[in-house]
Structure formats: C-alpha cells, structure tokens
Amino acid sequence: MLYYLFRFLDQYDIPGSHMWSYISFRALLTLIFSLLISAWFGERFIKWMKRKKIFETERDPSIDPFGVEKKGVPTMGGVVIIVSILVPVILLGRVRNIYLILMVVTTLWLGFLGFLDDYIKIFKRNKEGLKGKYKIVGQVSIGFIVGLTLWLSPDAVVRENMDVKMQNQEIVIKHKSEAVKSLQTTIPFIKNHNLNYSSIMSFCGKYKVAAGWMLFVIMTILVVTAVSNGANLNDGMDGMCAGNSAVIGVALGILAYVSSHIGYASYFDIMYIPHSEELVVFLCAFIGAMIGFLWYNAFPAQIFMGDTGSLTIGGIIGVCAVIIHKELLLPILCGIFFVESLSVIIQTQWFKIQKRKGKRVRVFRATPIHDNFRKLDSQLDATSQYILKGWPHRPFHESKITIRFWITTIILAAITLITLKMR
C-alpha cells in the first residue's frame, strides 16, 4: 500500500518518494521490517502461548538421546512467520501484481492447513493431527489453483529467448519483443537451458500445447505437494527447517531478480519474466521472517514452528520456483528436503515388503534421515534388523546435525546458481 502512496506523492516531487520505485530499496526495507516484526512479535507470542499453556505435551524420548528437555515449548510458531511475511509485503509490495497475489494466497492457504493440523494435535489431544488425505487435498488444491492461474491469467507471461549471437567474443541473448504465454522451464546441465513442456507432449499432435499446459499444472501440483511435505519432514530439530529455508530463500531471491531483469536474463540465457521483481520483495520478507524466527527457534528452541510454519514454508518455496520457471532446479536447491522425504519412503516401503515375508527389517535407525544421526543403538527396536545399523558409528548432538545440514544446503544453493552458467 505504501508503494502506491509514495508513487502518487512522486508526482508532486516529494523528496524521497522516488526511492519506492527501486526494487532494491523496497526489498531491503521489507527484509529489515520482516526481521524486526518476527523478533518483536515472536517474543510476545511465546509469552502469550505459555500463559495459555499452549504447547506440545508429548515428545518421543527415543529420538532424543541427549535428554534435552522439550516439553512445555510453545508450538504453532508458524503464525509468527506468516505475520512477519504478510505485513511488510502488503505494506511495501505492489499488491495488484499477479505473482505477489499468488504468493499471498499460497501463504494463507497452507498456513490455514497447517494451523488446522496443529490445532487438532494440541486442543483435540490427537498427536496424529489432520488426516494425511486432507493435507494432500489441501496441497493439491493450491497447486492446481497456482498452475491454472499461470495458464489462464493474461498477466502471467514471459519473454522467451529468441536469438543467440556472438559480439566481441561474448554470447548475447536476445528476447522476443512481445510477452507470451510460455511452457518453457529452465533445466540445468543442458546447452540451451530450456525445456518446453509442449515438446514432451508432441505425440498429441495439434493438441500438444493444451496437453503441455495440463502437464505444467500437474507438475505444479507435484512440486508444491512434494516441497511442502519435504519441509514438514525437515522440521524435526531446533532451527533446522528455518535455517535451511532461509538459505533456499536467498537462492530463490537471486533467481527471481535475475529473471526479472532483462539484462541479467540475457547474460545467463534464461527467460525474462516481466513484473516478477515483486517476488524479490516477497522473498526478502520470507528471509527476514526466517532469520527473526531463528532468534527463538535456534537450539535450545523457545518455540516450534509446527505444521503452521513448515507446510507454509515448503509451499512458498515450491510456488515461487514454479512462477519463475525454475521448478526443475528444486531437486538440487531443496536437496535436503528431497533426501528427508526419500528416506521416509525407503524406510516405510522396505519395511512393508519385508513384513510380508515375515521379517522386520528396516534400512535406517530412524527417519526422517536427520533422526538417524542422533539415535543410540540402545534405543533401537530389538525385534528389528537394521541394514545401516552401523551408520553413523556414534550419534551426534542435534545442534551439530542442524549446522551440518545448513552447510549442505548452502553448498546446494551455490551449485544451483552455478548451473545457470554451466552449458
């Protein structure tokens, strides 16, 4: 809202009003504002939750070999994250921007879904929370809405790469002069960096474009659901999900800025996406909220984000990647989320297969994979066999595991950005 106010005042040459037209100014201001809101509101939210005695009452001692006391810590801290994102975004962003609208809707939608899950766990004393099928329906629904909006909205357009020329020993990429609806997406490790969904559906003949858009919508649903669940699984140690997500947010912010700038888009040979600079503002709010939340969520945590936070965080990451046509980079950028999800799938499916044979065989000590690194041999199920029982040879403290996962995510983020120049 303030953006429109100061743009109006700029007509009357009010000193400083022109600064609001610069994306860098608004983005940095949003980051600072979000961080301060998160720090200020977080402290008060924690005190209020403790007064109301709203906290997790049941913790699994089998995955806490170091005896760190976790009972009595308030949860549903995702409320702090959501407020810290939305307030500065609404104040400082261009709220009529289609991409910003999609991000706000995603935040509210998945925030509400996660809130329902936490509410059932805490107030209904049901540790299972919202049934898995309802979570999936909620995630699929927002993925469908985002995919359909990007397909049908006249404002969601790109300017595709058109020509490649050599000038003074440098590659110069020219973009189409007209913005178009595009099914192209950036793909790493190939020469032209682009994959067209319609080309995959070329067997559909004259219907290949429509089929390509259907494939795009399906891909959007899969991305949003997968990343949202991956972030949810990653939220198992103090500061783990918030720290990893902050790093991912920085990488996505860089990708969004490059995609919104025709010069940088040409240099890196990727699609130029007009008006996507508002995603930079949103992602700066996201980063600020993560850092501010870490102030209280770092070990030993004073508050947990709960599903209110983790489902929302994953959805934000997935939708943002789809909007800037970088969803195929997520297996690298969100590698930690991917491994967390894969470990759970491997563990559950392998156990089911072996159980049919009358055996109780597990692959890992515990899943998600971060729990595998802190579980003692003495805490393992004596009736089960473990394929990787000796890995690791000793458990680690959760703060060490968290920091190592952060470092891994930083490396993966760097690799993701490097892929833009690898061709």
Residue ranges of each PLM-predicted region?
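Membrane-interface helix-loop junction between the first two transmembrane segments
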Residues: 43-61
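Non-transmembrane, extramembrane segments of multi-pass ion/lipid transporters
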Residues: 55-65, 263-268
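Juxtamembrane helix-capping/reentrant segments at transmembrane boundaries
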Residues: 59-73, 127-138
